[in-house]
Amino acid sequence: MALRRLLLPPLLLSLLLSLASLHLPPGADAARGRSGNRTLNAGAVGGRRAGGALARGGRELNSTARASGVPEAGSRRGQSAAAAAAAAAAASATVTYETCWGYYDVSGQYDKEFECNNSESGYLYCCGTCYYRFCCKKRHEKLDQRQCTNYQSPVWVQTPSTKVVSPGPENKYDPEKDKTNFTVYITCGVIAFVIVAGVFAKVSYDKAHRPPREMNIHRALADILRQQGPIPIAHCERETISAIDTSPKENTPVRSTSKNHYTPVRTAKQTPGDRQYNHPILSSATQTPTHEKPRMNNILTSATEPYDLSFSRSYQNLAHLPPSYESAVKTNPSKYSSLKRLTDKEADEYYMRRRHLPDLAARGTLPLNVIQMSQQKPLPRERPRRPIRAMSQDRVLSPRRGLPDEFGMPYDRILSDEQLLSTERLHSQDPLLSPERTAFPEQSLSRAISHTDVFVSTPVLDRYRMTKMHSHPSASNNSYATLGQSQTAAKRHAFASRRHNTVEQLHYIPGHHTCYTASKTEVTV
């Protein structure tokens, strides 16, 4: 018994060695499969992959599947040698395929690994290049994947990380430091300045090239001034005094000559009647009256005072007016010393420079641009017959009658102020402005003043005369052209062109007052 126990272990050991020797060829094939291509054991159940892990961390070129269905040595002690032989025959008939590893191509994109296990077409090998791999069926063209290095991402593909940097306190937006709006403001300001400068330049150019305005009076304004009638001398005096007393405006030339003496008179020889008359010499501008008393502004003269003091709204007073009222002859305005004073060179140059339109409708002012009238003395003509004195409007329009010879009184009489202002002289029928019988008839004809020209001694009345001269051609006829007409036509022209005190405008017509005038030609009607 003891011997039997001693021999039993060696027998079992020898049996195991014999069994190991029987399974030796399949084991060698398995060792070769791990070093070469990976194969699939045909004896594996369901074609399950048996080969395992990649050698060297999965970087080996080809891996061989280990036959999992082969029993290991000593695992099945009860199998027979016939079963071991059948397993060896099946291992020789196995089909092998390769797997292409994952790699980065030329564009830097990663391609995943794929298996070449299409056994029907025979594409079982991984072929191509390191950057382009595909399956093929030619064993000698397969790719040695262990020599490729494109298993890591290339450097040029790696993009730097973009980190969002939050703005610090120095990078914050400050509206006060923003200067982008300044450009808009500057551009708009320059455009506005250019527009304003252009407008001012246009206005200045128009004013510089504008033609000078002429002294034209509208017809309607002239009609209104004509219908207003003559202005009383007292009113003219007030306006003239206010115009003279007021201080001149700034930069306005002040006349060096006095305006107080508008119509100087001269002293003439005494007549046999021992009566003195002051006759105005209209063409003289240097002599001053010697018998006049100081009066306010000395505007009124012997030519205007008698009519002014006896002025009335009744036609019955026409009988006391001199014959020159009926002749209605316009005189030359340039012969008056008042107009000569207005045409001084200094004032003319100033007002022509200013180019103001004279406001002739405003009272108390003088015309700015005085019309230069011809001062040439016309040729002497035959003096017309003296018309009869107007007693009424009907008699003025009546046919011409014979003139009495009582009018032929001395013409060089000089009247004193007391005689001119006396009641007898005012209501007398003697001619106040009778022409002189001298060798120069034009001086006597120039004194034939119409009803509206009695007030011609002041600048205000000169303004109205110029208004009528510019507005109506019939009102500015020459004195000699008027004298050439018939006597009846002259009467009608005098009262038709300027009806200032017509019946429609008279508010009260007093009765005729018979006064003793001590006149040689007194006629009572």
Curated annotation (Swiss-Prot):
One of its GO terms (molecular function) is ionotropic glutamate receptor binding. PANTHER family: PROTEIN SHISA-6, PROTEIN SHISA-9-RELATED. Its main location: membrane. Involved in maintenance of high-frequency synaptic transmission at hippocampal CA3-CA1 synapses. Regulates AMPA-type glutamate receptor (AMPAR) immobilization at postsynaptic density keeping the channels in an activated state in the presence of glutamate and preventing synaptic depression. May play a role in self-renewal and differentiation of spermatogonial stem cells by inhibiting canonical Wnt signaling pathway. One of its GO terms (biological process) is excitatory chemical synaptic transmission. Residues 241-294, 469-495 are annotated as: Disordered. GO terms for cellular component: AMPA glutamate receptor complex; asymmetric, glutamatergic, excitatory synapse; glutamatergic synapse; postsynaptic density; postsynaptic density membrane. The lineage of its organism: Eukaryota, Metazoa, Chordata, Craniata, Vertebrata. Component of the postsynaptic hippocampal AMPA-type glutamate receptor (AMPAR) complex, at least composed of pore forming AMPAR subunits GRIA1, GRIA2 and GRIA3 and AMPAR auxiliary proteins SHISA6 and SHISA7. Interacts (via PDZ-binding motif) with DLG4/PSD-95 (via PDZ domain); the interaction is direct. It is found in: Postsynaptic density membrane. The gene is Shisa6. It holds the Pfam family Shisa_N. The chain crosses the membrane at residues 181-201. Keywords: Cell membrane, Glycoprotein, Membrane, Phosphoprotein, Postsynaptic cell membrane, Signal, Synapse, Transmembrane, Transmembrane helix, Wnt signaling pathway. Belongs to the shisa family. Residues 31-180 are extracellular. Disruption phenotype: Decreases decay times of miniature excitatory postsynaptic currents (mEPSCs) and light-induced AMPA-type glutamate receptor (AMPAR) currents in CA1 pyramidal cell. Residues 202-525 are cytoplasmic. It comes from the Eukaryota. The modification Phosphothreonine is found at T458, T502. A motif (PDZ-binding) lies at residues 522-525. This is Protein shisa-6.
